[in-house]
Amino acid sequence: MTKRSEAKYKIDRRMGQNIWGRPKSPVNRREYGPGQHGQRRKGKLSDFGVQLRAKQKLKGYYANISERQFHGIYVEAGRLKGDTGENLIGILERRLDTVVFRAKFVSTMFAARQFINHGHIKVNGRKVNIASYQVKPGDVIEVKEASKQLAIVLEATQLAERDVPDYIEADHSKMTAKFIRIPALSDVPFAVQMEPHLIVEFYSR
């Protein structure tokens, strides 16, 4: 297992859940956290602990976003009209790295961030190398012509473990995707239950 995979699956082990629904997750074989003390029975979490865990799980799912960046996203979500938890999910799903992952151009969130940083993605015909770039409905995302035959791309499009959600239209023959709309929490194909309302409670303490 590579260092990148180890870091990724460490999040699974810490949460005790296969948060991306990957067949190779070690949580599929055991239900305790990482490290030598991972097998110890855990007591019931306090309300604060439950809220913190919900935040850590969502941050981890989106390739371990830093606390500073995640809190900034939360603040932005609170400024928008409507439910803050729903807005939080909407902003996260509009991130370019999330859309690249959802479109099955790469196999993981972590790979999507690296793929974008290395300049393999265009938005509306222009190269964008910022993973946190906010995609808008109607935007067209594409893999650069020179990158379409990379093994990481060809393998990802064949993954049977997940489908492209209906708020994204993907054409793998052309390696393009169109972002149709901002999804609601219920639209997002999370492998485990995400609870943004608990994150709102956490930051509202």
Curated annotation (Swiss-Prot):
Keyword Ribosomal protein: yes
Keyword Ribosomal protein belongs to the record: yes
UniProt KW keywords: Ribonucleoprotein, Ribosomal protein, RNA-binding, rRNA-binding
Pfam families the record matches: Ribosomal_S4, S4
Domain S4 RNA-binding, first and last residues per copy: 94-157
InterPro entries (alphabetical): Ribosomal_uS4 (IPR022801), Ribosomal_uS4_bac-type (IPR005709), Ribosomal_uS4_CS (IPR018079), Ribosomal_uS4_N (IPR001912), S4_RNA-bd (IPR002942), S4_RNA-bd_sf (IPR036986)
Family to which this protein belongs: Belongs to the universal ribosomal protein uS4 family.
Function: One of the primary rRNA binding proteins, it binds directly to 16S rRNA where it nucleates assembly of the body of the 30S subunit.
Protein's name according to its UniProt entry: Small ribosomal subunit protein uS4
Originating species: Bradyrhizobium sp. (strain BTAi1 / ATCC BAA-1182)
